[in-house]
Amino acid sequence: LYFYGDNVLYQCYARVADRYKDNNRYILVMDLISNLRRYQRREYYRFSCALEMKSRPLEKEEAEEKVEDKLATDLPLKGSIIVDISGGGLRFVADYAYEEQSLILCKYRLLLNGRSKEYSLIGRVLSVRELENRRGVFEHRVQYINVDAGEREEIIKYIFDEERKTIKNKREHSDLLKNEE
């Protein structure tokens, strides 16, 4: 079964316990046989993080090309913080707001195999909202446009590597606490 909430989808398994007809409507009584859990419809897993990023809007000519190789390199970039990243895009916060549906250049570095690599990717701003608890700070959701398959795979590899590190650290921390008891 799937349940829709406020912009959220939940899923569980259920068994039909009873069925009957009432006022020309068929009614099913269901017994839940699993816990209700949030269902993620995304194509890519989102990894929570705090990474520095620099960005700028694309010029009209650049937006028409949508190719990273032909971007102007001398235009100023603004700083921001990526708060989650996936193989399909990212979410970042900044003290400025881009226009929704605009194309932007996103530049950030990821540590892969012990080496830092810079990514310069074009993204479409899907949504922008001012944070309720931090006036003047805006959250942006961005979807990558024309990202190279190799770069997408590297980003996904980075996410899985970081998740592995997090799980390992939690286990080690848990083991330390058990040993202290």
Question: Where is each model-derived feature located?
Answer:
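Structured alpha-helical
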Residues: 1-181
